[in-house]
Amino acid sequence: MTVKDYMQQLGRQARAASRDMLAASTDDKNRALVAIADAITANRELIIQENARDLENGRANGLEPAMLDRLELTPARFDGMIEGLRQVAALPDPCGEISDLKYRPSGIQVGKMRVPLGVVGIIYESRPNVTIDAASLCLKSGNATILRGGSEAIHSNQAIAKCIAAGLESVGLPASAVQVVETTDRAAVGELITMAEYVDVIVPRGGRSLIERISNDAKVSVIKHLDGICHVFIDDDADLDKAFNIALNSKTHRYGVCNAMETLLVASSVAEKILPRLATAYAEKSVELRGCDRTLAILPNINAAKPEDWDTEYLAPILAIRVVDDMTAAMDHIAAHSSAHTESIVTENYTKARKFMALVDSASVMVNASTRFADGFQYGLGAEIGISTDKIHARGPVGLEGLTSQKWIVFGDGEILN
């Protein structure tokens, strides 16, 4: 069978399964999620073995450390998959929810009903836990899904896929509601993103080159973000202890993720008070610092930042630092260099905080909090299927509601239009 024929087969099966999922009750979907969690738990040793196999192959093939980090199913990440499934099962089901119901002068009653998107294609690299995150959210929101993980995680994903299929079938839902592409041929991606007759939306998760290619070539809608160039701004009215903890956590909690801070902006009036302390803490964690001229005047032993540093998502222990005059200058820098993902201000000034929130045009804007909170789990969405920096359909972490749309519904009692 050719790759095209194989993908067409997956598409047909997904479209048929989407009709079954549309009819599935909330109880059916919740029981499926719990059954999948039980199957993942029962097969923990096998999944970890397959993940170790992928890691070994990745090291042999020269995968970068950031990619290997995303590939590894640590005990905490494994437990997180199971917790995520159970949490999504406990979330309210958005499907069938009716809102804005009102009577019109004609006598008809008009409202909106939340409904699944249909078939969601998800393309991602490295992280095998995305297989579970995506499956759980698509199932609970009534969608069928086709998952195309990276070739580097093929064995992990296949092991997880067997658990998903077993969980679905155990409660009478079709195994084809969640299908994992089992070929590593890159042509499968090209087929998936152009099957407009079967796939309603594509969610790509990966590097910039992957997402740009999908955005350019797809014949269906795409929910995406290109980069995670996230900023923390330490205002001159900041509590410096809060600022220290937020700036340290935003960068060093985990490097290879899109909500890690990549650029630190510091008001000039507090720069000499906070930067030396932060530099010592970053040095203890082996973070390379790259600063502007004003930063170098305070921290002469760090590297000079180049123009491209302000536009780089490092996904590594590297941090760019710029000293700015005030909040206006910080917002100007963010407007010029941000990827519209997440920005945070540290300040005790309520007026400034509200202004920053109103004028910074990113998917998540925070006050006195680490950028690492820009996550569907932390926002109470359960697992997230991705983060969107687009402004239409979904924005920010995409959870259950982001995987649905609304249709108009009309109730009448024999009314006709005169």
Swiss-Prot record:
GO terms for molecular function: glutamate-5-semialdehyde dehydrogenase activity; NADP binding. One of its GO terms (biological process) is L-proline biosynthetic process. The keyword Protein biosynthesis does not apply. It comes from Teredinibacter turnerae (strain ATCC 39867 / T7901). Belongs to the gamma-glutamyl phosphate reductase family. This is Gamma-glutamyl phosphate reductase. The lineage of its organism: Bacteria, Pseudomonadati, Pseudomonadota, Gammaproteobacteria, Cellvibrionales. CDD domains: ALDH_F18-19_ProA-GPR. Its main location: cytoplasm. PANTHER family: DELTA-1-PYRROLINE-5-CARBOXYLATE SYNTHASE, GLUTAMATE SEMIALDEHYDE DEHYDROGENASE. Keywords: Amino-acid biosynthesis, Cytoplasm, NADP, Oxidoreductase, Proline biosynthesis.
